[in-house]
Amino acid sequence: MRPFLLRAAQLLALLALALSTEAPSLSAETTPGPVTEVPSPSAEVWDLSTEAGDDDLDGDLNGDDRRAGFGSALASLREAPPAHLVNVSEGANFTLDARGDGAVVAGIWTFLPVRGCDAVAVTMVCFETACHPDLVLGRACVPEAPERGIGDYLPPEVPRLQREPPIVTPERWSPHLTVRRATPNDTGLYTLHDASGPRAVFFVAVGDRPPAPLAPVGPARHEPRFHALGFHSQLFSPGDTFDLMPRVVSDMGDSRENFTATLDWYYARAPPRCLLYYVYEPCIYHPRAPECLRPVDPACSFTSPARAALVARRAYASCSPLLGDRWLTACPFDAFGEEVHTNATADESGLYVLVMTHNGHVATWDYTLVATAAEYVTVIKELTAPARAPGTPWGPGGGDDAIYVDGVTTPAPPARPWNPYGRTTPGRLFVLALGSFVMTCVVGGAVWLCVLCSRRRAASRPFRVPTRAGTRMLSPVYTSLPTHEDYYDGDDDDEEAGDARRRPSSPGGDSGYEGPYVSLDAEDEFSSDEDDGLYVRPEEAPRSGFDVWFRDPEKPEVTNGPNYGVTASRLLNARPA
């Protein structure tokens, strides 16, 4: 009975204190960072408020008591618990403080671990006509374990629970919950319950450890830089005063060495007849270029300072970069000319160009047109080089009479004709010669192959003669045949011997047939020594009277005929006519 009475006394004390105490305004604080409340887009609403029962004080809360949206319904019957969003870096300490205007006399802290909660925000949630701020979690946010008790807060006169919770606030008699060296496993919902229900809800998100601070990186080392800021046009009337000194902005960078500087003002007349007056910036940095010394329209353009008049100068011999922008007035300098023109006349109207040098190099420049209303022209700043005047040679200096080098007039080198293909070098000559030789070899080889192929084709092609049918046929090979030596009149090689050859009479009478010529060669002798008689051609049938010679049909073999060996060898070695 004693434990039961003790528990009953605890519950009665909690209920009495809760009814007599107003709901406090809750806050959350983290160490080292403050509480962050971030609005979120629409997401699924989970109100994780629960009602604490008798069994909740004995140990872990039942996870089934968490009902989505049920806490909002309870919020319409009583004051909703404040909701807080706390972001903590990994490894940091944080403290959840539930104190407000009214102290919480007794309560218990619970923890619900969740994962995947990327979109979390504190948003106004309305149920019917009642609205209250509540935590809004994304759909990907899911609990990993049931909600469990992690600490309690009771007055000193109330006996404590026998079981020590896993995490106990060091301030046992105040509604604080402190977590040391937070890890990602500490991400979740922390709720403070009292006898009437949830009193405060905290969502703690433990993120990655912030990167260690890096050593500050200074600007890259650079040389001094200057920039002139002035008016590009000034209108005046005769008798007025105008100042040519612009504002010079200086950035000395990391330089610690003294430097020299000059400020030069150049004057050029700007005729009113020029609709546009051009100032070419490349010529400020390269005043000796041929294009700058001999521009196309020198009267309406400012190109090289060598073509203008130097009207004023400031020369600084040694100046410290530690002075910053004050070096123009703090450093000693030598000057001549007038920077401020008082009681100006109309003759002083024109273009004034300021060129500033730093250690002998052009650092910045600026221009201003000082003119009356009648002589005002439009000035245009060009970023390209001007066009070269016709007849200007392409050699150094750009002039055919004299050039300027560091203020000294020297004769110009002789002009050379312009070669659009560049200067001829031995390498180019070698390439041209090699190309010509290769082309000659290719053409000669092609011609030789054509001649060779044509000769081979002519040698292998048989000779054909046309016929009356319009076709072509192989031409017969005619040669003399051996006959009786009585018909021999001379050598075959003698052209006149052909006329003396005898022809046998036609067996057909006047049929027009003319037999073949008989051979009169001495070599055509009868091969047989037994028969010394004359060879008589056998009678043949009459033939046509055409003048075209046809190849005779094969003769029957004659036993004692002439020797055709010489004739056969001649036919085999004969070439087509």
Swiss-Prot record:
Record flagged with keyword Lyase: no
Residues on Virion surface side: 21-428
Glycosylation (residues): N87, N93, N185, N258, N343
Entry PTM: Phosphorylated within the acidic cluster. Phosphorylation determines whether endocytosed viral gE traffics to the trans-Golgi network or recycles to the cell membrane.
Keyword Transmembrane helix: yes
Stretches the record annotates as Disordered: 481-538
Alphabetical UniProt keywords: Disulfide bond, Glycoprotein, Host cell junction, Host cell membrane, Host endosome, Host Golgi apparatus, Host membrane, Membrane, Signal, Transmembrane, Transmembrane helix, Viral envelope protein, Virion
Topology term for the membrane: Single-pass type I membrane protein; Single-pass membrane protein
Bias type Acidic residues, positions: 488-497, 521-533
Region of interest (Interaction with gI), ranges: 117-141
Summary of the function given for this chain in its UniProt record: In epithelial cells, the heterodimer gE/gI is required for the cell-to-cell spread of the virus, by sorting nascent virions to cell junctions. Once the virus reaches the cell junctions, virus particles can spread to adjacent cells extremely rapidly through interactions with cellular receptors that accumulate at these junctions. Implicated in basolateral spread in polarized cells. In neuronal cells, gE/gI is essential for the anterograde spread of the infection throughout the host nervous system.
Family statement: Belongs to the alphaherpesvirinae glycoprotein E family.
Protein name as catalogued: Envelope glycoprotein E
